[in-house]
Amino acid sequence: MSLDHTQLPVGIFFMQAQEQVVFGRPAAQAVLEQVERMGARRVFLTSGRTLGQLDDGPLQRIRRALGDRHCGTWSQIRAHSPREDVIDGALAAREAGADLLVAVGGGSVIDATKAMLMAIWMKLDTPADMAPYRNNQPQGEARPVEAPVDAIRMLAVSTTLSASEFTPNAGVTESQTHTKQSYSHRLMVPVTAILDPQATLDTPPDLLFNTAIRAVDHAVESFCSPRANPATEPLSLQGWRLLARSLPAIQADPTDLDARLKAQFGMWQAIAGSVAGARTGASHGIGYALGATFDIAHGHTSCVMLPAVLRWNAAVNADRQRLLSEAVGQPDVPAADLVAALVARLGLPGSLRDVGVGPEHFADIAKRALVYVNLRDNPRPITRIDEVIEILELAV
């Protein structure tokens, strides 16, 4: 028996400040129960413009259920959560005297609402005020996000499969430079995430499926992560398995609420390993650069980049990738091919050409991508522009 710790895996499993996940119940009922549990009296709703314009969508049903507890709605959040939308929403919530925020929407809405919490806590009034609090600041320039003792919190009702409701991080876009900025605080994670498959029925299929491939990206990259461990691996693998099976079922029958709930469970499992410490890699890092620069949906960046990254990484982790193939009963099919086939089956873009990106953009994308730590956390670490370009060429 060896008593030498140097032979043991070393890591930290991060627990989130999330109290509950409510699943399989009507969102309006679940929100009202959570509001009553928390003793909130002035509830402020956030969403994107499309949901805000529905006559009887999840936002409208929640608003009716809240009755006189509803103190306002901000339905102007755009894709990629621009800083301007964060500040405008925070000012509106502050003016309304909100004591609880409820985000109803996809990743951009939930991320923006998390950043709104920070803006309310720190009394930020302009987009520029946010800059000192972003992650990965140069040494000496960063300011910590501080939540007051009675910090306003949020609930999240997801209408997509982005999984933003399970993380304490907010991805926000700086419009002038087209760069994605990350903000985080442990209390920015929603107190409760509500998974109601019915709330996804009004989501266009392309949006639902492209966020689903983003969830696949979470599962696959966290499973392949050098920081994966026996606690995170089952989460990532089950997330991939559930998504690979449920998404074709949803495509075959869009009204199948059981398949939609299984996809929500898959999305939840997929992100769980990542936020616990098994970090994502180059597909995410390059995807951040693509999304912010060319206004490409995060899910579409995963559709395009994940197969290419898997192929590039296979030189160092082919055995690991085979476990992904075995998990869905196809051990002899490369994981990259399985992901690409799922993307194609769902009618999503499968190449950079499909999203309007050509070789003339590669050098700029590579330069922007290198700032993201995900590239250094990749199973095959990336530190040079030419390495990013190699991957981009696999995605043409």
Give each language-model segment a name:
Residues 24, 45, 82, 107, ...:
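Buried hydrophobic positions in well-ordered alpha/beta secondary-structure cores of metabolic enzymes
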Residues 28-32, 54-56, 83-86, 108-113, ...:
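Short glycine/serine/threonine-rich phosphate/pyrophosphate-binding segments
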Residues 60-61, 89-90, 109-123, 167-168:
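Short Gly/Thr/Asp-enriched flexible loops that form oxyanion-binding sites at enzyme active sites
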